[in-house]
Design a protein with these regions (language model features):
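Conserved N-terminal beta1-alpha1 strand-loop-helix module at the mouth
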Residues: 1-76, 82-85
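Conserved anion-binding
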Residues: 76-77, 83-130
Length: 130
């Protein structure tokens, strides 16, 4: 079965560029689901360049919106994810100098840390991918 996930990061990019509360990522997420999307993807970056902590909180509270939260291995970001219980977590590399995610996770360097993170999410019934 084909499933459609919509990434709404750039809704937040426009909002932040306008220094406004609009467009609202939560409204965009609800609209995407209403129009047939199966899930929403957002990336909470360490620098918060688009999605903010409050966006994660608000979207996670909407249980009708299946959320795939992309996060780095940063402990502060992990705490936010664990506290808000998204449906899915995708662990992604992050480099502050990059414009968008480039490359992959260094599994050999971070294997034990990644294993520990996956166990934490599994214990909360949050599916995790790399």
């Amino acid at each position: 079965m084909k499933r459609l996930g919509i990434n709404i990061d750039h809704i937040a990019t426009v909002r932040n560029a306008r220094k406004s509360s609009h467009p609202d990522p939560l409204v965009a997420a609800k609209y995407a689901i209403k129009c047939g999307a199966n899930s929403i993807t957002i990336h909470l970056r360490e620098d918060r360049r688009h999605i903010k902590d409050l966006d994660v909180i608000r979207i996670c509270k909407e249980k009708k919106i299946p959320l795939n939260l992309e996060i780095s291995l940063n402990h502060k970001i992990l705490k936010i994810a664990l506290k808000n219980n998204p449906n899915y977590i995708c662990l992604v590399p992050e480099n502050r100098k990059e414009i968008t995610t480039e490359g992959g996770l260094n599994l050999s360097k971070n294997l034990n840390k990644i294993k520990d993170i996956i166990i934490k999410f599994k214990n909360k019934n949050i599916r995790t991918s790399l």
